[in-house]
Structures are given as C-alpha cells and as structure tokens.
Amino acid sequence: MVDNLTHLKQLEAESIHIIREVAAEFDNPVMLYSIGKDSAVMLHLARKAFFPGKLPFPVMHVDTQWKFQEMYRFRDKMVEEMGLELITHVNPEGVAQGINPFTHGSSKHTDIMKTQGLKQALDKHGFDAAFGGARRDEEKSRAKERVYSFRDSKHRWDPKNQRPELWNIYNGKVNKGESIRVFPLSNWTELDIWQYIYLEGIPIVPLYFAAEREVIEKNGTLIMIDDERILEHLSDEEKARIVKKKVRFRTLGCYPLTGAVESEAETLTDIIQEMLLTRTSERQGRVIDHDGAGSMEDKKRQGYF
C-alpha cells in the first residue's frame, strides 16, 4: 500500500504515525511552536492526526521577545482560529538582566533566552516529550539526530548515546527525570515543506514572501528594521545605510539575528521554483549558526532544541 502513496503522502503518513505514537506513549507531551513554516506544517499534521478531535497536548512558544512583530500577530491569529491551548514562556532571569542580541551578542542571547528558557518551561510544566520541527537536511548536527532524541535530566543531548531506530519502531522508555525531543519532520526537505504547504493550503507568516522591506547590511547579512529597538543600537552612519530592498526570509528567528535574502518570489509557486534552483542552505541567514565551529551541536548538547 505504501508503494501507491506519493512521496509527500508517505512523509505525511510517517509524521502522523510518529505524532500519534508519542501521544500514546508519553504522559505529558507538548508541541513547540516557533511560528515558522516547519511549525506550521507540524501543527497541521498534528491536527490531521487527531481530527475531528482537538489536540491532546498544548502548544508552547518559548518567547525571546525579539521575534518579528508579524510573527506575534500571526501566532495570536492562529491560536484564536484553531482554538489551541497555547503556553508562552519568557525567561524571567533574562528579562531581569536585560539580555538582548545587541548588547550581549547572539551566543549569550540564544543560550539565556532560548536554551535556558526552554529548559525552564519544560521543567515548570513537567513535559516528558516535546515535538519540534527540525529537519535533518537543515544542518549537519541535526542530520545525525534520531527522530526520538533522548535528553538526560538536565535536558542535554549526547550524540554518542542514541538508540537505534529500526524502520518505524520507536523506543520511548525513559527514566525518571529524562525526556525526549521528537522530530516528526526529520525526513522532510525544505522543498518538501514548501510543496506540502502549497498542496494543503497551510497558512504561513507573510515574511516568507518577497516584498519591499527596510534593511541594513551588517557583516554581509541583510537585517530587517522591524521595530524601533534596533535603531537604538545603530550609529548615525549605519542609519544612513538603511535601504529598501525586495527581500524575503527562508527561515525565521529573532529578527536582529535573522538575515533576509533578495528575492522576487511573491507566491508559493515562485518560492518552489526558487527552491528548485537554489544551492545554498536556508540557515545561511541565521547568525547563531555561525557563532563557531560545531556551534549548533554545542548548543544542542546544552539543551537547545
């Protein structure tokens, strides 16, 4: 029967199986919602998995307070339209310290507001499994991670201590205090994601589509002027270099750490055509991926998603 399914339908069936398996195996799962395209697809698959019922778990957004304003508006709209149970968590210690990507740099900002914030939220609510939208084709450390990614009592990942996954059989047994991160989209590619969004009519943040936007080039990266806070950290000379360009985003994160790409892709079909021709990674614009050699793996070892 599998042979009769299209490539995307096979991926869909695999992801739905994983989501249902986790819901059946674990006591208190949660779905992380970063508001990006992969989260949109994962949420769509989860709703399909349990239709016509509601999701048997909440969705959670670990908020750094530096996402694009359009992302916040989109999140609130989706939560209202879908009737989701949303948990938001902001690291109170980071807020008290005034942590931001300009003053403290991308590495410290990411560690405190994302990694430590995520660990706080998981501990606070006692979640034993957390769904995430990471894919193996995104980055080399993610390429070697299992669908069920086991974490110790401090949420750390040990790439040398992973369980074998045979076909579609997943071992979810964990000791007290341990947990897993689950990646239902592990075998999807960026092109698969876009084709599925197109076929299923999944709503996404408009930032993925090309439009005239104010940007400034910093260290070879086009940073969008999303709100007034960024202007406080620019010199007069830098402010003079702010220009309007037709750009879009292939990946979304904290706006001062996420680079735009010049593009003419205004529709989903345009984006798919662009994906067929591009030879660069979608994460080339993520500043946190360039903090140092092996930086993503180091972050994941400390509990980053």
From Swiss-Prot:
InterPro entries: PAPS_reduct_dom, Rossmann-like_a/b/a_fold, SO4_adenylTrfase_ssu, Sulfate_adenylyltrnsfr_sub2. The keyword Nucleotidyltransferase applies. GO terms for biological process: hydrogen sulfide biosynthetic process; sulfate assimilation. Keywords: ATP-binding, Nucleotide-binding, Nucleotidyltransferase, Transferase. It comes from the Bacteria. It holds the Pfam family PAPS_reduct. Its EC number is 2.7.7.4. The keyword ATP-binding applies. Belongs to the PAPS reductase family. CysD subfamily. With CysN forms the ATP sulfurylase (ATPS) that catalyzes the adenylation of sulfate producing adenosine 5'-phosphosulfate (APS) and diphosphate, the first enzymatic step in sulfur assimilation pathway. APS synthesis involves the formation of a high-energy phosphoric-sulfuric acid anhydride bond driven by GTP hydrolysis by CysN coupled to ATP hydrolysis by CysD. HAMAP family: Sulf_adenylyltr_sub2. Heterodimer composed of CysD, the smaller subunit, and CysN. NCBIfam families: CysD, PRK05253.1, PRK12563.1. This is Sulfate adenylyltransferase subunit 2. It comes from Pseudomonas entomophila (strain L48).
